[in-house]
A protein has these predicted regions:
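A structural boundary/capping signal
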Residues: 1-279
């Protein structure tokens, strides 16, 4: 097992809240970029944070620190959202985002959080339905920020509008918005990044790459039945029938009352003779 793979294995099994988001994101990228120097990129992020920290007064307020962070990340360093080619897989690999200074909400959020934490801000990722956001904790509450929109602050009405586009004919009140603003655990952030990649690779017909992403999600979430179902479908497309059978069966063990349990049972019955031919 390679050194990055060993590091990923340790990280995937950790449920600690202080896991480095940058390290996890770079280890995801190391699957695609053989020989990627993860530590070199971590040092670059550390240096970005150090440069900004040295400029700030020790008694700076949270609001002032956020203004300084936004100016530094978006104006000086030049990070921005890739609205022209949103589904370019490079937007999901942190090494590429650091090099190209362009990304999607979740990778920009990782950069933003990592630099912000190095200047003393309490920042958390928020797995909001429309796209990934950042929460900054204050003494008197919290601010929701959108790194994809250059760190714009979002109020309840802004968030309601974003949710209303998804929840047709359902009134989205403040309590519903609040329910989506819980800080995301590192494993959930990594899983969301990998799901993005899986979707991109499936769309491109790159099923082996999609399978690699899916397997990493399973490592992060071994109790999530849906992820075994997703991986089983990829195994089927690759004609890995035994592996597909194993995952479908595990899916039903984890979720015997699944809505699609009858469909999965049929898939198992159809795959069993195909797998038997391989003996």
């Amino acid at each position: 097992m390679s050194a990055p793979a060993q590091r990923w294995e340790r990280l995937a099994s950790s449920r600690a809240q202080d896991v480095s988001l940058a390290e996890g994101a770079l280890l995801i990228a190391a699957e695609e970029y053989e020989g990627l120097d993860v530590d070199a990129y971590l040092e670059r992020i550390e240096e970005m944070g150090s440069v900004l920290r040295r400029r700030l007064r020790s008694d700076i307020s949270t609001t002032e620190a956020l203004i300084a962070l936004n100016r530094y990340v978006f104006d000086e360093l030049g990070f921005s959202g890739n609205s022209e080619d949103y589904y370019d897989p490079r937007n999901s690999y942190l090494n590429e985002v650091i090099e190209r200074r362009i990304g999607i909400p979740i990778t920009l959020a990782v950069v933003y959080i990592e630099i912000g934490r190095r200047i003393g801000l309490t920042l958390h990722g928020v797995s909001f339905p429309t796209h990934f956001l950042v929460k900054c904790v204050l003494h008197e509450g919290a601010i929701i920020l959108d790194p994809y929109a250059r760190g714009a602050s979002l109020g309840v009405e802004d968030l309601q509008k974003r949710l209303s586009g998804l929840a047709h004919d359902v009134e989205v009140d403040a309590s519903i918005v609040t329910s989506f603003l819980t800080p995301a655990a590192p494993v959930d952030i990594f899983a969301r990044m990998l799901r993005n990649l899986r979707v991109i690779h499936v769309e491109k017909g790159e099923h082996l790459k999609a399978l690699a992403a899916s397997s990493r999600i399973v490592e992060l979430m071994p109790e999530c039945a849906d992820e075994f179902g997703e991986r089983a479908e990829l195994y089927e497309k690759l004609e890995c029938f035994r592996a597909a059978l194993t995952d479908y069966r595990h899916y039903l063990r984890l979720n015997p009352q699944a809505r699609d349990s009858h469909h999965i049972a049929r898939r198992i019955a159809e795959l069993e003779p195909l797998a038997a031919r391989l003996n």
